[in-house]
Amino acid sequence: MGRPRRRGRDINGVLLLDKPLGLSSNDVLQKVKRLFSANRAGHTGALDPLATGMLPICLGEATKFSQFLLDSDKRYRVVARLGQRTNTSHAEGALISEREDICHTGTDDAALDSHRGSSQQVPSMYSALKHQGKPLYEYARQGIEVDREARSITVYELLFIRWEGNDLELEIHCSKGTYIRTIIDDLGELLGCGAHVSYLRRLQVATYPSDRMVTLEQLTAIVETAQAEERSPNAELDALLLPMDSAVLNFPEVNLLPTVAAYVKQGQPVHVAGAPGEGMVRITEGEERNFIGIGTIAEDGALHRNAWL
């Protein structure tokens, strides 16, 4: 018989991890889960191994609300290496073409403008999107091209930062599902020289502040120091977590009396005076305004529960 599976802690909250270079999002997720001894953990939108930056990790009950972060806007800083196009649109891909005739007359506002606003984007074959249960990148590595549907994306802001030599640096604020590598590949073709991503960092997810990010090194140091001093690291680790409702603070709040909240918890719709006319809401209970879940205001004005603690 195998050893019994150890149950983790019932710890709930959101950790803003500064994902390091070279590790997959799942790699760092598992490391964080072990360091916190958490029973459940999930990330909220993968970053490539070659990307760094903000990766919100939901622990425990917070995993119920991770979808709302998956659906949120993102902000990135990216450096495009002009003159070289690769099959993956990043630095570790195979070189497809190389051109020396790189235009240095300016930022080419027309090329940048063409990527601002709403558009349709075809995901890269070297992406984690799944086709028949298998990631697209697995097909690509076998030389198989799969038809992909274009998806609606929005680039809210595309800022020119600098252009030095063959490096063009941009900051991009975009909607969910936007592939920065695809934007850079398309931009390189519009500039007539080809391009790939040489550096990518996620600066922000939703409205989370970048100064609350922590690194794996910081987490590991906390655990190792506690072990050396023969004490628990849990209190110090838990202090780094943001509350569960931080994932849904963009939704308007509906505060319920405990007696009314009891009906909603049982799955019964209720009408609440002063609630928004429709849409998703963040539900709190009592004078303490304890977060208890997410609900939807239907067309008839009734509050229905969605994700619940």
UniProtKB/Swiss-Prot annotation:
One of its GO terms (molecular function) is RNA binding. Substrate binds at H43, Y76, Y179, L200. InterPro entries: PsdUridine_synth_cat_dom_sf, PsdUridine_synth_N, PUA-like_sf, PUA_sf, tRNA_psdUridine_synth_TruB, tRNA_sdUridine_synth_fam1_C, TruB_C. It comes from the Bacteria. Keywords: Isomerase, tRNA processing. Signal peptide: none annotated. One of its GO terms (biological process) is mRNA pseudouridine synthesis. The keyword tRNA processing applies. It is an enzyme of class 5 (isomerase). The keyword Metal-binding does not apply. The active site is at D48. It catalyses: uridine(55) in tRNA = pseudouridine(55) in tRNA. Its EC number is 5.4.99.25. Responsible for synthesis of pseudouridine from uracil-55 in the psi GC loop of transfer RNAs. Belongs to the pseudouridine synthase TruB family. Type 1 subfamily. This is tRNA pseudouridine synthase B. It comes from Yersinia enterocolitica.
